[in-house]
């Protein structure tokens, strides 16, 4: 009986519990990071597309000014 009591209070037990929590949270954190990365990549593509359109419009504006 006494050995069981000591096992429950041992720091090794609490360490393994922490590891359990990390293994549970790790996939969730990874998934959140993936979602954030995808969102940032999508926003970056949008910004690049807008910059391309601005460059095209600037060239057209310069052409019309030259006429």
UniProtKB/Swiss-Prot annotation:
The P gene has two overlapping open reading frames. One encodes the P protein and the other the C'/C proteins. Seems to stimulates transcription by the viral polymerase. May play a role in viral pathogenesis or transmission by insects vectors. Belongs to the rhabdoviruses C protein family. This is Protein C'.
